[in-house]
Amino acid sequence: MTHGIRRKFSSLITRHTSLMKHDDHQAGRILTRREALAVLGGTVLLASGVSPRPGMAQTPPSCIVTPEQMEGPFFTDVRLNRSDIRSDPTDKSVKEGVPLALTLRVSAVGSTGCTPLAGATVDVWHCDAAGVYSDSSGNTAGKKFLRGHQVTGANGAARFTTIYPGWYPGRAVHIHFKVRILAGPALGNEFTSQLYFDEAVTDRVLARAPYSVRGQRTRNSDDGLYRRGGGRLMLALTESGTGYAGEFSIGLKT
């Protein structure tokens, strides 16, 4: 697929560009309530932490305003259709870390609310506990750990088994994701953003091995990209066994 024929999901944003560290930048902004009303013809999108005024219509929880953020320099189109992304297919090694069961729910937003979007390809990638991405440089070239995609089912869900990400200087703990339509009349549509983590949970995770050997991390408040919409991209986490389960719902205007 060439850049010239890529069409982006509007994802209820307006466009602008702002350069960030590590070649990351935010590619959109969160709509105001007035703008969301205009887009949806009276349907209100609920963003995290925002309550509607009394008497104002509400949409299902899956209808949220999702700011777009650039994929950064570490995306590779590996086309690895797998749910468990912890291993590297080149040598079968498995990345150590606190388990994370990740569910992304993709919905198409219309004038009457949200409908689960089936058949969307959802890519996920992130760094390991040491803050290193696969297939980025040096001894990770050709590696594919902590990368993969799933195709959403009838309920719009894509599920992954992974680990809690580490961090690297200048960036808070985060996960990258990309939603793509690779078949059908909407072929070429895509939407890219990032997910962030609650600081208290991250503090507990990073106190455990193999994360604990590292120094002081970059916190959400010190991440310039997080400050531009990251509060609306927080992964909802619950404890699950020795790790966590996380969910995030993505409302896209296709």
Which stretches of residues belong to each language-model region?
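Exposed beta-sheet edge/beta-hairpin loop segments within beta-rich domains
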Residues: 165-168, 235-241
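Intrinsically disordered, low-complexity segments enriched in proline/serine/threonine
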Residues: 14, 54-56, 75
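N-terminal twin-arginine translocation
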Residues: 29-35, 44-62
